[in-house]
């Protein structure tokens, strides 16, 4: 029987009333969890965070907030093996890919904990030097950085449910703002468990962390000018968020990370028999296969001198042929499946478009066989 994921809002875990969405194991298509946010009062969830989490965090110095980040990192790391297993179960990740996400999360929290410990022992951060404001030396001024009195709303992508959650939360908590995190529904199982751990360990002040598992519903309609939104995902969805009427009217700050475009460039002076050439091929293959290519830093363009095209194509095809694709729980598997059917459809559509302009040098556009 699949698990029923709960959101964590208003200081308590809540389940949606209807319209359950299913989370699957990408390897088997088995439903591993279901979730919904139907019936959850988004306005109340935000108000609870503003009225409880915000004041509690603002009372703390940067060093004290940094200490919380360190505690969060340690609490999650203590459950590392469990989190890695969930990453494979709901994300289709190999052990190595799961570590990339989970260890990235705890490492980021630890990094900002160390950084925060070097900042002010007060709740404020001085910005620049004291400036003379008039002829009299008695009139001086200085800028200070202070926390906003709202909620940091984080809408995250499906590919990094651990790291994406932690890297956004770390900077918000260090800045003295409560967090409402909404993971992509398809891979929310990992984030949900991380939140459960942090709540059980009582790491954060009440209201400093909220979780939505499922649709955001009318969440954006209840934001104020003191709230902020950080979104990772497609440019189209980012545009919809930026264009939300309430966000425009309230002047809500919105940060969007979307549709990265990355390249690997081989210089014209490169020797095809050199160690550096081999490294180039290995790194390109890694970017294609790590997390099945489902990451923002994946290489989309490989730029090589025309006279090296055949050599690079042959070497890259050989490198990819050695990668075993299959059930990520099995030994020797280097690449797991795509996360869901929509990702498969998107990849196949992309391949079809590319073949109008390019020639395939390895594989085909079918789903393919998986080692089990």
Regions found by a protein language model. Name each.
Residues 1-137, 322, 339:
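N-terminal Rossmann-like NAD(P)+-binding subdomain of aldehyde/semialdehyde dehydrogenases
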């Amino acid at each position: 029987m699949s698990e029923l994921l709960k959101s964590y809002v208003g200081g308590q875990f809540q389940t949606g009333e209807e319209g359950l969405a299913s989370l699957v194991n990408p390897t088997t298509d088995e439903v591993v969890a279901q979730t919904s946010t139907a019936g959850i009062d988004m306005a109340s969830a935000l108000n609870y965070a503003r009225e409880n989490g915000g004041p509690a965090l603002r009372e703390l110095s940067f060093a004290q907030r940094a200490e919380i980040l360190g505690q969060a990192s340690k609490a999650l790391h203590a459950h590392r093996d469990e989190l890695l297993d969930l990453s494979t179960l709901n994300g289709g990740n190999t052990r190595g890919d799961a570590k990339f996400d989970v260890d990235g999360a705890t490492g980021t929290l630890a990094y900002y904990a160390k950084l925060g410990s070097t900042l002010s022992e007060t709740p404020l951060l001085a910005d620049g030097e004291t400036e003379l404001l008039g002829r009299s030396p008695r009139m001086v001024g200085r800028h200070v950085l202070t926390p906003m009195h709202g909620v940091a709303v984080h809408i995250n992508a499906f590919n990094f449910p651990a790291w994406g959650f932690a890297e956004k939360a770390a900077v918000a908590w260090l800045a003295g703002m409560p967090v409402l995190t909404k993971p992509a529904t398809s891979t929310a199982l990992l984030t949900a468990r991380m939140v459960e751990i942090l709540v059980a360990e009582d790491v954060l002040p009440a209201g400093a962390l909220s979780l939505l598992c499922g649709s955001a519903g009318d969440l954006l309609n209840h934001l104020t000018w003191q709230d902020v939104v950080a979104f990772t995902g497609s440019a189209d969805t980012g545009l919809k968020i930026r264009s939300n009427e309430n966000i425009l009217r309230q002047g809500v700050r919105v940060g969007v990370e979307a549709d990265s475009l990355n390249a690997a460039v081989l210089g014209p002076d490169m020797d095809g028999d050199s160690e550096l050439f081999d490294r180039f091929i290995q790194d390109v293959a890694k970017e294609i296969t790590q997390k099945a290519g489902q990451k923002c830093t994946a290489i989309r363009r490989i730029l090589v001198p025309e006279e090296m095209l055949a050599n690079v194509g042959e070497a890259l095809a050989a490198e990819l042929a050695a990668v075993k694709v299959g059930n990520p729980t099995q030994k020797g598997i280097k690449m797991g499946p795509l996360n869901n059917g929509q990702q498969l459809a998107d990849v196949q559509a992309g391949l079809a478009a590319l073949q109008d302009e390019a020639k395939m040098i390895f594989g085909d556009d079918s789903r393919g066989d998986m080692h089990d």
